Design a protein with these regions (language model features):
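Residues that scaffold, gate, or flank divalent-cation-dependent active/transport sites
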Residues: 1-159, 163, 281
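DNA-contacting surface of Y-family translesion DNA polymerases
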Residues: 4-9, 16, 242-380
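Short Gly/Ser/Thr- and Asp/Glu-enriched loop/turn motifs at secondary-structure junctions
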Residues: 157-161, 199-202, 330-334, 378-382
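A generic structural motif
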Residues: 161-166, 386
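Catalytic palm subdomain of template-directed nucleic-acid polymerases
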Residues: 164-183, 250
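Long, highly charged, low-complexity intrinsically disordered interaction regions
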Residues: 174-231, 394
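Acidic, metal-coordinating catalytic segment for phosphate/diphosphate chemistry
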Residues: 351-434
Length: 434
C-alpha cells in the first residue's frame, strides 16, 4: 500500500526532470568534440533484419518498460556514409530523419522528424551522428537509478523524462534549491544537462519544464496565473485533433479550459481527467510500476510489389517479436498486422486467440492474416506488427482444445529462445524467412 506523504503545509510537491536534447547530449557525453557545435542524431529504418545473411542483431532491453520499446541493434560500426547514404544508379542519396537536434542546430531551423537532407541544407555545418540506442538506454537506466537514490518516489515517464514526488520530504521553500542541486549533480555525474519543473500538481510540473528549458529550473507557485494565457497546444496530451475540437468552443488557452468545467465534465472520464490535469486539481500521484501492455515493431522501406517478399519480411519481423515475448515471459492473445502502401493507403488486420503463445502459432496466424488482407494494386512501403492483451498461461483462461499442443509448442519455442540468447537472434530461422 502506498502512503501519501504531504509536507507541513498540507500540499504535494512534484518535480519533472527532462533531459535536454537527450540523444544529442548522450553523444556529447562520450565525445567532447561534439560540444558547443550544431549537431543532430539521425536514424533510419533498420533494414538489416531482412538481410538473408546473418547480421548478428542483438536486443537492447536493459531499460524496458511500458514507456520504451526494445531496440534491436547491430554491433557493426556506423559512419555517416555507411548509414545515411545510399547509392542508386550511380547517384548518392541521403536517407534518414532527425531524431534529436542540439539547441545550436535548432537555431538554424532544424527540427525533430525532419529529413536529414533538408536539415543539412538549413545547417550545412551541422555534424550528423548515427543513432546509438544501446548508449541511450544504458544512460537512461543509470540516471533512473541515480534519481531513486536522491528522491523518495520516482516515476520514469519516458526514456528521457522522470517525475519525482518530494511531498513531506522537502518543504516548499526548500524545493527550488534542491532541484538546482539535483540538476548540478546529474551534470557532474553523467555530463548530461537536465531541465526541471516544480509544482504542487504533477502535470503542471511537466508543463513547467518547458518554461525551464534549456538547462533551467522553473517553479510554478500560482497555477491559475501560470496557465491563464498558456496556449492549449503547450499542454501534454492535447494534440491537433483535440485542439480543433476545443477551438470550436472558442477555447484557445489553458485559462479558457478552467472556465469551461461543465463542458469538460460533459465529455465524461477523458474530459474530467484532462480538466483536472490542466487546472492542477487532479490529485494524481506518482506511478512507480510500469507494465508493458504491448510489443511491436515496424519497418519502412523502398517500394516492394512482390507479395512473397512482403510475406518473408513479415515472418522475419515476427521472429523479432517472438524473441521479445519469450524474453519478458508474457502470453499475448491479440495479434496486429498493418501493411502500408504507396500514396498513404493502409490495410490492417487484428486477430484475438485465447491460446498459449508459440513461434509456430504466431507465424501461422500472421500468414492467415496476411492472406485475408485485401491486397491493393500498389507497392508496399511499410510493415507494422504488434501483440497485446497479455494473459496467464492457464487452462482456465485459454482454449482447452488446443492447450496441450500449444503448451508443447511453447516449450519448443523456449528451447529455441535459449539458443538465440546464447548465439544470436538469427541463429535459427524458419523456412518462410529465407
Amino acid at each position: 500500500m502506498d502512503i501519501l506523504l504531504i509536507n507541513r503545509r498540507g500540499s504535494r510537491l512534484f518535480l519533472h526532470i527532462d533531459i535536454d536534447s537527450f540523444f544529442a547530449s548522450a553523444e556529447r557525453s562520450v565525445n567532447e568534440s561534439l560540444k558547443h557545435i550544431p549537431i543532430c542524431v539521425g536514424s533510419r529504418s533498420n533494414l538489416e533484419i531482412f538481410n538473408k545473411k546473418r547480421t548478428y542483431i542483438k536486443l537492447m532491453n536493459d531499460n524496458s518498460g511500458a514507456f520504451v520499446t526494445p531496440v534491436f541493434y547491430s554491433d557493426k560500426k556506423k559512419t555517416f556514409e555507411s548509414y545515411f547514404v545510399d547509392e542508386i544508379e550511380g547517384r548518392k542519396k541521403i536517407r534518414g530523419i532527425v531524431t534529436t537536434a542540439s539547441y545550436e542546430a535548432r537555431k538554424c531551423g532544424v527540427k525533430t522528424a525532419m529529413p536529414i537532407a533538408q536539415a543539412l541544407q538549413l545547417c550545412p555545418s551541422m555534424t550528423v551522428v548515427p543513432s546509438n540506442y544501446p548508449l541511450y538506454h544504458k544512460l537512461s537506466h543509470k540516471i533512473h537509478a541515480f534519481m531513486l537514490a536522491h528522491i523518495p518516489k520516482v516515476e520514469q515517464y519516458s526514456i528521457d523524462e522522470f517525475f519525482g514526488d518530494v511531498s513531506g520530504w522537502k518543504e516548499e521553500e526548500e524545493v527550488y534549491a534542491f532541484a538546482k542541486e539535483l540538476q548540478a549533480k546529474i551534470l557532474a555525474h553523467f555530463d548530461i544537462p537536465v531541465s526541471i519543473g516544480i509544482s504542487k500538481a504533477k502535470w503542471i510540473a511537466k508543463l513547467a519544464t518547458e518554461s525551464a528549458k534549456p538547462y533551467g529550473v522553473y517553479e510554478v507557485k500560482d497555477i491559475d496565473a501560470y496557465i491563464e494565457n498558456m496556449p492549449i497546444k503547450a499542454f501534454p496530451g492535447i494534440g491537433k485533433g483535440f485542439q480543433k475540437r476545443l477551438g470550436e468552443h472558442y477555447i484557445s488557452t489553458l485559462g479558457d479550459v478552467k472556465r469551461h468545467k461543465a463542458l469538460f465534465e460533459s465529455w465524461k472520464k477523458p474530459g474530467i481527467q484532462l480538466y483536472g490535469r490542466v487546472t492542477g486539481t487532479d490529485n494524481e500521484g506518482i506511478s512507480t510500476r510500469s507494465e508493458r501492455k504491448s510489443i511491436g515493431i515496424s519497418r519502412t522501406f523502398d517500394v516492394i510489389h512482390d507479395a512473397s517478399e512482403i510475406k518473408r519480411r513479415i515472418m522475419i519481423m515476427a521472429r523479432h517479436i517472438i524473441y521479445m515475448v519469450m524474453a519478458i515471459e508474457v502470453n499475448p492473445t491479440s495479434y496486429y498486422l498493418k501493411v502500408g502502401y504507396e500514396y498513404g493507403v493502409k490495410v490492417k488486420k487484428t486477430l484475438t486467440v485465447d491460446r498459449v503463445f508459440s513461434e509456430k502459432l504466431f507465424k501461422s496466424m500472421l500468414a492467415q492474416m496476411y492472406d485475408e488482407i485485401v491486397h491493393l494494386n500498389k507497392g508496399a512501403i511499410k510493415l507494422t506488427l504488434s501483440v497485446s492483451n497479455f494473459s496467464a498461461q492457464h487452462k482456465k483462461t485459454l482454449s482447452l482444445m488446443d492447450f496441450d499442443e500449444d503448451n508443447h509448442e511453447n516449450k519448443l519455442s523456449k528451447e529455441i529462445q535459449n539458443l538465440r540468447e546464447r548465439f544470436g537472434l538469427d541463429i535459427i530461422k524458419t523456412g518462410d524467412e529465407l
